[in-house]
Amino acid sequence: MANKTQLRVEAINNGTVIDHIPANIGIKVLKLFQMDKSAERVTVGLNLPSSALGAKDLLKIENTFITPEQASKLALYAPHATVNQIENYEVVKKIPLVLPEQITGVFECPNSNCITHGEPVDSSFKVLTKKEDIHLKCKYCEKVYSREVVTDLN
């Protein structure tokens, strides 16, 4: 039987740790940042026990540091996730997640009649928040979608 203090996921020397991702969202985050195509070692923890969430996902990406722009995209998938930059096995920086006001070229508009499906234009959404709910309003067709509807398509 494992010692109670034993880590279930190995520590990394340098890189980024994204913790407290809601369960079943980790793979989407992995694909969003194309970590599944990275040559660096990526450790994925799915459905790990969490006192706050019940279950959570965790990503550790060696020798890779996410940008503030990537952190704002991450906020759409996991607004309460924590992002830590690691150097020499120590947390050197905690990156706050802030929802962007606008997000362009990341998500596909769910409206099949939207101009973004037939023309060479990047999708663009205004991010709307109301309490804990996050909605995205398409710049072109002006339809409003819940965050889950848009992020589930991609």
Curated annotation (Swiss-Prot):
UniProt entry tagged with the keyword Repeat: no
**Co-factor note (free text):** Binds 1 zinc ion per subunit.
Q: Which UniProt keywords apply?
A: Metal-binding, Pyrimidine biosynthesis, Zinc
State where Zn(2+) binds.
C109, C114, C138, C141
SUBUNIT field: Contains catalytic and regulatory chains.
Q: Describe the function of this protein.
A: Involved in allosteric regulation of aspartate carbamoyltransferase.
Q: Which family does it belong to?
A: Belongs to the PyrI family.
Name under which the protein is recorded: Aspartate carbamoyltransferase regulatory chain
Instruction: Look up and give the organism this protein is from.
Output: Aliivibrio fischeri (strain ATCC 700601 / ES114)
Name of the gene this protein is made from: pyrI
